[in-house]
């Protein structure tokens, strides 16, 4: 790869070619006296940026918001959305282009769309976002990426007084379901059409082609777009469920039109498994609980379809597209869980086997990640660690006997089966207490824990000697950790 200096990055900003109503050009209002806490060489490679640039003043200036990318525009993009099921109106974000990716500076100050917010992000939430996107990428789940984390001593008032930070995140596009909702709510079909054409041409060109992504009928391109987004969203929900990930704030403005995991706020990877686990303590009704995420994904797609109705005024056709969501999700989820259970395919009778395991884990508070990881050890003949994951070891053993009988029916060698299971059952996930340790170190100016976590989370399925503490159960002190929408 030919590495580029910051000043040489290509800055083809296709979003800025949209009509002026879609954004406002601005100078960010970032925190004072910024310091670079961490930069991500893997993410920099995606845009060809030389990691040697991390040590330059220009890098700090750009990714703190004190200077634009050379030759690029800094834009505040407008969108809207439903938050906790209620229409929230106009929102916005700061972004710019680089190397075919959009870069977004979260915490770089207010925009014309900020409403009552202050445009700031805090260290706590910024460290969590920086780590989470890389953790999800390591797990093989579609996600935005993190490029840089800049900190400042500027005070920011949240539930307590915290310090400011700016995290730069990357994606091919930050267009959201709420981007379409914005123009639909304002009854501006021309802008809605412009946005749909932009998304189709750049990311779903197959929707222009009959027999590829374009569906039959007068509005085949728009229906094809909805079908493609529906499929990606269903697959993403299956990915989340399979690793015990709770997003926490699945508002329509946090739903990517590309099927990426977007906006890491009060998320969590489950420790003790609960079917109705709520990771966001602001979610008093449990709207975004773990077991509700797939249905919320579909609810959000209905909001997107409603926004597209002006362009495809055929309710039955729109509904027919959305009716395909459940089958895609179920097939994908069952496929992922088959791998976690060491099954070559998921048969109808395996649904009871899976449901019984999840109920047993729920009733006995088993650790989601470790229980599945230890199944591989059980297949190798070491059943005790798996059974020790449950209070009632006999019940766990009885369930495992059923799985072993199912394994015997396909004749696969135990070592090959266990190795395949290890490739889909992670050993390391970003547990809240690990993120908290990194936050506390970062508050002292120490990025060492971030380095360790990135090392582990980039290879979450492989045991890495010397880091067993990062794969263990959460310590007692972590029981009181809470995350919320306060970032």
Swiss-Prot record:
Nucleotidyltransferase involved in the post-translational modification of proteins. It can catalyze the addition of adenosine monophosphate (AMP) or uridine monophosphate (UMP) to a protein, resulting in modifications known as AMPylation and UMPylation. This is Protein nucleotidyltransferase YdiU. Mg(2+) binds at residues 254, 263. The lineage of its organism: Bacteria, Pseudomonadati, Pseudomonadota, Betaproteobacteria, Burkholderiales. Keywords: ATP-binding, Magnesium, Manganese, Metal-binding, Nucleotide-binding, Nucleotidyltransferase, Transferase. Belongs to the SELO family. Pfam families: SelO. InterPro entries: SelO. One of its GO terms (molecular function) is AMPylase activity. The active site is at residue 253. Its EC number is 2.7.7.-, 2.7.7.108. Its cofactor is Mg(2+); Mn(2+). ATP binds at residues 92, 95, 106, 118-119, 169, 176, 263.
